[in-house]
Amino acid sequence: MTTVQNLGGPCIELKHSLPSEVAAISPSVDKVMLLIRECGCVADGETDVEIALREALANAVIHGNHQNPRKNVHIRCCCKPDEVTIAVKDEGRGFDINKVADPTAPENTGSVHGRGIYLMKAFMDEVHFEEGGVVVRMRKSSSQAAKKDSLK
């Protein structure tokens, strides 16, 4: 289910739920990215947002919900004129961010897994884990907004 609302202020919000299936990730990313492109909130950072969103959804489906067909993943995306915030919530038990292995450590560089959180943090301006790790909240500002802020 997907809903899009103009909340009366600067935020256009999309709420979307997807089943815990890997095949549902790409169509869900496409829906969110369509809104982001139409809003033009981070035109210079769309690819970064898309990569981070894919990683967040993959983590939620695979690690959070363990691809359990009875569980869903929930997305909330808020597009403002110069930024986008995205929250991804799974129905799993959560995790301790401090116990996640560093993918840049020599013993982990050969692994084919374990880079999702690293990529989210690399491509987004802010990444926070909430509610014991079942929610990841990410924010990306446009580079134009960052330039305006640096002039203040």
Please annotate each region the language model reported.
Residues 14-27:
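STAS-typified acidic loop motif
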Residues 30-54, 109-110:
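Conserved short strand/loop->alpha-helix "switch" segment adjacent to the catalytic nucleotide/phosphoryl-transfer site
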Residues 1-15, 61-152:
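Conserved beta-strand-loop-beta-strand hairpin that lines the nucleotide-binding pocket
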Residues 26-30, 128:
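Two-component histidine phosphotransfer core
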Residues 54, 58, 62:
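Short alpha-helix lining the ATP-binding pocket of the histidine-kinase-like ATPase
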Residues 27, 48-51, 83, 122:
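Alpha-helical macromolecular-interaction surfaces
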